[in-house]
């Protein structure tokens, strides 16, 4: 069983108030007109906000957590690159550290390790994965392996502070004059700060 998580499973989320660093996040979806549209859009907003808090906002001033972390540069994913990432994280943060990547990156890492994969990657009793004896958290919002991307993070995510600063009411518009199908929009406001720049490191593809 692979361990699927979201950024919010790893980072403490608290209530907050809007300030100069607050990120405005809007989620949109076409939905059937039903009583649970608000709940559906709240889930959609969480998914959208996870991508933006990690990757940044296109055309906006917020660069995302992946831009804030220190990085180790590599041209490809190898065992040596993973070892360099591991040792770059100061020892004080390793006790609670986890690896975070998407499932495609994990599969490519296993292929790159080849016959030595079982020396690097092991399974726990619940069949969740360990890499270098540290938990692997698979997150759909993490980017794929490509030049310039940071597809793997390693560190103590308790040092990331996320504040939920509220959301606007659900907005609904009919599609093509039909009351059965709606364009739903919900906007939320969040702050995301890496409290300690040494607590999380990333592997950057160059």
What are these regions (language model features)?
Residues 26, 30-32, 101-105, 156, ...:
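Helix N-cap / beta->alpha transition motif
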């Amino acid at each position: 069983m692979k361990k699927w998580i979201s950024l919010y499973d790893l980072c403490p989320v608290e209530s907050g108030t809007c300030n100069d660093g607050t990120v405005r996040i809007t989620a949109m979806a076409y939905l059937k007109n039903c009583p649970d549209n608000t709940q559906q859009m709240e889930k959609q907003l969480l998914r959208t906000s996870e991508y933006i808090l990690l990757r940044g906002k296109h055309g906006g001033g917020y660069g995302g957590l992946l831009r804030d972390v220190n990085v180790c540069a590599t041209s490809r994913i190898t065992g040596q690159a993973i070892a360099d990432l591991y040792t770059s994280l100061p020892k004080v943060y390793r006790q609670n550290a986890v690896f975070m990547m998407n499932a495609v990156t994990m599969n490519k890492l296993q292929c790159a390790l080849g016959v030595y994969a079982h020396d690097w990657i092991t399974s726990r009793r619940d069949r969740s994965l360990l890499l270098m004896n540290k938990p692997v958290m698979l997150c759909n919002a993490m980017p794929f392996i490509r030049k310039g991307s940071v597809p793997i993070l390693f560190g103590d995510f308790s040092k990331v502070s996320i504040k939920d600063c509220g959301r606007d009411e659900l907005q609904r518009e009919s599609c093509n004059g039909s009351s059965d199908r709606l364009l739903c929009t919900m906007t939320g406001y969040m702050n995301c700060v890496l409290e300690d720049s040494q607590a999380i490191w990333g592997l950057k593809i160059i």
